[in-house]
């Protein structure tokens, strides 16, 4: 059955190419980005290392299905803790980021520069709406110096919140997130367990704008196999083009790199050959291994099919960051966040990292000159109808805008597969 679907996809792609190749292609505007300073480049490398450590920690959590992390935003959250902390509370935040050898001013200036560069949606021609807000109990007043510095470096807002009326407090948090993302992320959380400390909330909406768009008329309903015995109905989008591609026969995986508009970043997908839990691939996934795989990629004709739609994920990163060494800030009896309020009256109760990530067809027009090439007649197939890992990578610094996995997209159960 799956083989028939693949054959039908190729036929549909061929017809779509014939229909669209006649359209003139507008040249994409070249991307321009200022070169990062040495301190920002160093922190870009450190944040990439953090990305894999945190992803691996979360992947081992049986309660976690889909994962969506923005490592640069997580790094900024650690910078914020370092900015507001003293003694071990501050030094642990830097250590988790592997930035203990950097001065405090280098960390904050470097992370601020990196965050501004990677989240510049105009230069990158992507949609990335990002907001960070630190909520404190109504009894706490944030220090003016901290408010000013955290806004300057991390564009972080601050607010008091009264959890005596928990329903109203949750509504306020979710309304702020919805407003920040233009309604794309309607809810961060349904509940907050610890209400006597500070809550750090990151709310994001990200939508890639492809360097060459998918066929907007070639969208159909297919099955996504969460497991061999559980399939959900999803909308799939398709296109054929020339991409960096690698098929690892030994490890039974394939990967493809898709440039985003302006080519300042790209989306990389790593997928097992067959339906299986991602645990095997995740054990292989490191910053060094990714570099090895990317070094083996070659430009190939690839017919790509991806799920279309919005994936919404909220993670409370508190326990996962604690597992990486951030133990003082989250401990009510040990936390020293006195630079935040002037007193040792705060601890980090939750770190909500909430993202809506939209997979859509939008992008630049096709380069029509490539479609007469012989190699496009027999493309490699990249049919993402089962769980996969993905990364959005900055082409200049190697920093990761996002790292995640799609295990269970939105969709109704279809039928059990044999």
UniProtKB/Swiss-Prot annotation:
N6-acetyllysine PTM sites in chain numbering: 207, 319
PANTHER family found in the cross-reference section: SERINE PROTEASE INHIBITOR, SERPIN (PTHR11461), SERPIN H1 (PTHR11461:SF27)
Residues where N6-succinyllysine is found: 94, 296
Signal peptide positions (record): 1-18
SUPFAM superfamilies linked: Serpins
Localization in the cell: Endoplasmic reticulum lumen
Keywords: Acetylation, Chaperone, Endoplasmic reticulum, Glycoprotein, Phosphoprotein, Signal
Designated gene of the protein: SERPINH1
Stated name of the protein: Serpin H1
InterPro entries in UniProt: Serpin_CS, Serpin_dom, Serpin_fam, Serpin_H1_serpin_dom, Serpin_sf, Serpin_sf_1, Serpin_sf_2
Role according to the record: Binds specifically to collagen. Could be involved as a chaperone in the biosynthetic pathway of collagen.
Ranges spanned by the short sequence motif Prevents secretion from ER, renumbered to the chain: 415-418
GO CC annotations on file: endoplasmic reticulum; endoplasmic reticulum lumen; endoplasmic reticulum-Golgi intermediate compartment; extracellular space; membrane raft
Species name: Bos taurus (Bovine)
Keyword Signal belongs to the record: yes
């Amino acid at each position: 059955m799956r083989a028939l679907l693949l054959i039908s996809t190729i036929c549909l792609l061929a017809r779509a190419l014939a229909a669209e190749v006649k359209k003139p292609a507008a040249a994409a505007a070249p991307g321009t980005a200022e070169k990062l300073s040495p301190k920002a480049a160093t922190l870009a490398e450190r944040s990439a290392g953090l990305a894999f450590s945190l992803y691996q920690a979360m992947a081992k959590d049986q309660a976690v299905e889909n994962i969506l992390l923005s490592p640069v935003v997580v790094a900024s959250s650690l910078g914020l803790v370092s900015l507001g902390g003293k003694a071990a509370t501050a030094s642990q935040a830097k250590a988790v980021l592997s930035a203990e050898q950097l001065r405090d001013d280098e960390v904050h200036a470097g992370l601020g520069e990196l965050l501004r560069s990677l989240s510049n949606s105009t230069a990158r021609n992507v949609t990335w709406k990002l907001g960070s807000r630190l909520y404190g109990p109504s009894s706490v007043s944030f220090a003016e110096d901290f408010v000013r510095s955290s806004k300057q470096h991390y564009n972080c807002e601050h607010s008091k919140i009264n959890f005596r009326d928990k329903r109203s407090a949750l509504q306020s948090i979710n309304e702020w997130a919805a407003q920040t993302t233009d309604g794309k992320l309607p809810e961060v959380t349904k509940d907050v367990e610890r209400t006597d400390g500070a809550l750090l909330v990151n709310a994001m909406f990200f939508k890639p704008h492809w360097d060459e768009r998918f066929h907007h008329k070639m969208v159909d309903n297919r099955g996504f196999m969460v497991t061999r015995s559980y399939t959900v109905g999803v909308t799939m989008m398709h296109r054929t083009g020339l991409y960096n591609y690698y098929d690892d026969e030994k490890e039974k995986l394939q990967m493809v790199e898709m440039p985003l508009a302006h080519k300042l970043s790209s989306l990389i997908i790593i997928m097992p050959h067959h339906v299986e839990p991602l645990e095997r691939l995740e054990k292989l996934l490191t910053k060094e291994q990714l570099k090895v795989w990317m070094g083996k990629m070659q430009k190939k004709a690839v017919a790509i099919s991806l799920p279309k739609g919005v994936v919404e994920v909220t993670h409370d990163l508190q326990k996962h960051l604690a597992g990486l060494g951030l133990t003082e800030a989250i401990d009510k009896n040990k936390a020293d966040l006195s630079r935040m309020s002037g007193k040792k009256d705060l601890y980090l109760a939750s770190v909500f990292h909430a993202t809506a990530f939209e997979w859509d067809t939008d992008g630049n027009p096709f380069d029509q000159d490539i479609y007469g090439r012989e190699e496009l007649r027999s493309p490699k197939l990249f049919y993402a109808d089962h769980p996969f890992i993905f990364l959005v990578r900055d082409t200049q610094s190697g920093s990761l805008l996002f790292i995640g996995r799609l295990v269970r997209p939105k969709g109704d159960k279809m039928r059990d597969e044999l």
